[in-house]
Design a protein with these regions (language model features):
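NTP-handling and nucleic-acid-processing catalytic cores
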Residues: 2-109, 113-114
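Residue patterns forming the tRNA-binding/recognition surfaces of aminoacyl-tRNA synthetases
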Residues: 87-198
Length: 198
């Protein structure tokens, strides 16, 4: 969600990310640390059930809009390599998984979406706020709705050559054999002249 970039407080990489492979060469102890991530059950079905564990690495990222702000980078067991790029930014105030991770590792929780347009000075969140609202604490996005902020931030990232608009579909394979039994029928016409038509 590009609208929540001002609330980013960490970057998380999949243990299978190519940057992690490069780090293993320079940091021999990293392999031992990676074993602690308990990667046995990290598939899409189990990812919400497992304990979120991370390894902080000695690199930092520069915030795309705040050049003087650096963001710590972790290797985390809840980031999957086969979805997107295998790297995500964490916005703890607006994603429960990120919120839990930030609490565990004592990271900043910066509220950037609120029901009201007013700026919030103190963070009193007890859980992530995941509803829509207005952008706050977000520089040039302040006062915009979530949808407006998404559009503005994507355009700014494209203008700065830091990103581009993309859509990732999460479609799963599914069989049609039970479609008639479980759901809407699949229209098939049996024509004596032309054969089966779908």
């Amino acid at each position: 969600r590009p609208d929540t970039l001002f609330g980013a407080s960490f970057i998380a990489l999949s243990p299978d990310h190519k940057l992690v492979d490069k780090l293993k060469k320079n940091y021999p102890n990293l392999n031992k640390e990676l074993n602690k991530l308990n990667l046995k059950n990290t598939n899409e079905q189990n990812i919400d059930k497992i304990e979120k564990i991370g390894i902080k690495i000695p690199l930092k990222a520069t915030h795309p809009f705040l050049k003087n702000k650096t963001i710590p980078i972790f290797i985390a067991n809840f980031v999957l390599i086969d979805y997107g790029t295998g790297a995500v930014f964490g916005c703890p105030a607006h994603d429960q998984r990120d919120f839990d991770f930030a609490k565990k590792y004592d990271l900043d929780i910066i509220e950037v979406v609120s029901q009201e347009k007013k700026q919030v000075r103190e963070n009193k969140l007890r859980k992530a706020y995941t509803d829509n609202g207005y952008l706050i604490n977000s520089d040039f996005l302040n006062g915009l709705t979530v949808d407006e902020a998404k559009e503005v931030s994507i355009k700014k990232l494209e203008k700065l050559n830091l990103g581009s608009r993309t859509i990732n579909y999460r479609l799963k394979d599914w069989g049609v054999s039970r479609q008639r039994y479980w759901g809407c029928p699949i229209p098939i016409i049996y024509c004596k002249k032309c054969g089966i038509q779908t």
